[in-house]
């Protein structure tokens, strides 16, 4: 019996001394009822299935393209059973959601404008080498299946991750190789003539970048180096696009004619343009956002009212045309006059304010304002056992720094759903997190779990980069010793034909309207020395790398200005808040871990109960002690040291011990945790007026503190004790006082 015909193509990525990677695209075997399906392999041991399907009818009432991208992480792909209660996959992991965004962002602009049929792309991870990162493979898989589906799609789109390792940009790096990388970028693009146009960038400095740069002399990811990385990604993207195009030419379905719903017809655009263009020019010279929005809404109502009788039943088209005319007015003013909506020049930054310690009791807090964008950052510190546990296909199983971003509807003066975070909020939190991770202190330097929350209280452009700035302030206020402060800025781009030539204008610190009416949202975060994170989204089919390089340099000037404002508010870490827990680290021999824990956890539980501290022990012998105050932490440290780093007791040493048990032949006294001695019944006579002791409990009781002296240590290390009576203690004190006096006399 003959099976289905399988067709394939391959892209071989040559990384020189780092070896070759083979990306194989295959179709014809799996998911044959989907409109388009493709299996994509990387080096034969990681396999993803991408399936693209489309609804048969357009979605009614939709004025946008209903594209859905999903990633299904199957735990069997890594030979694991899910760790959830029901032992099956549930809601998508954060990594899966971020992978969805990586695919959606370059794919969405490539669909024909006006498509209203629902399109769904589902990528399922079927097999994975734990050392591989699957997200960038998923970009290529989703592009491949969409090309095969017969949808109106201007692919192929290639995606590649390049990492700067030992001064070389390496494509498709493995997790193990990323430990030596200082910077990594996911770049997606398409072939445009003889060049590659970039459609999406997601980049960050690595966790180890600071140490690699400062201690090992690795190349810092400056704007120039990042620009080189964008150029280095182009040949890889081209090879991936060519492999996809080769398979699509042989196996793709014919493009289906789908109904296209234009936002408006030409006759309505001409009427709206004639009625509103001149007035809109005046409206968009108003600097204040609310006043400008109110004037724009009033003009829109006026235009709709005046034209509705002429274009009966086409009010939606009039509204859409009004938005298009607004966009045209704003863009032409920027390109021709170099003046923006609020009257700023292309490189001007709005008014900045920065303030720390804005909330009581929390461990760290700050507010950062840029124009009408207002972000509050709040930092919480806790024991390392509170770090996030991760159950995903990634080899990363825990995360010490957790950055959450909240965008309530009131931040834009609207109503809406509140509750669990949406994909956008997860993406913005991840971006701010990546911007700050490279400058965080190590676990050894600062043994705390850190949760950073960014509250977008007011939004008019780039709340994610505002979150980076507010977080820098808040972390320093909480006492986190950052290696360097980080600031972020959002850049925009407007491009159009002016006098027969394509002209580009890069905008610094974009407004929300400039984001909506522009062609690019380009976010750049970093220190004064290098870039720590980048995110690029575009509405165009691609942007020349030279334009992006110029925008990077423009962003650096803005970043340095913002860093000056942050440093004026707080330039060194504050003292830890009195409400923050105190965490200290103790190193003990690995073979002593069992003694500290004790049988069934008896010893460690006893220390925690006695001191009120929380204790966690790492496999390497590092013990983290957390307590609400310093004395509790110090007491726990002393108790642990007494067990794991003990001094050998000697005859004659005195201790203030605690009676832990009484027997017919005496009392056991605890000197230090794990070290007890016997106070024999005959010795108890010394504290019973020399009388015979018939019942030990009549003389001492469990829990009683008693001063004792070690009188004997037998061959097995057993300690014999004697009580220190008042006369003995006084004599000992006199002898100790006499010794320095005699020394001085001599």
Curated annotation (Swiss-Prot):
It comes from the Bacteria. The keyword Zinc does not apply. It catalyses: RNA(n+1) + phosphate = RNA(n) + a ribonucleoside 5'-diphosphate. Its EC number is 2.7.7.8. It is found in: Cytoplasm. GO terms for molecular function: 3'-5'-RNA exonuclease activity; magnesium ion binding; polyribonucleotide nucleotidyltransferase activity; RNA binding. The keyword Ribonucleoprotein does not apply. Mg(2+) binds at residues 515, 521. Coiled coil: none annotated. Involved in mRNA degradation. Catalyzes the phosphorolysis of single-stranded polyribonucleotides processively in the 3'- to 5'-direction. This is Polyribonucleotide nucleotidyltransferase. It comes from Renibacterium salmoninarum (strain ATCC 33209 / DSM 20767 / JCM 11484 / NBRC 15589 / NCIMB 2235).
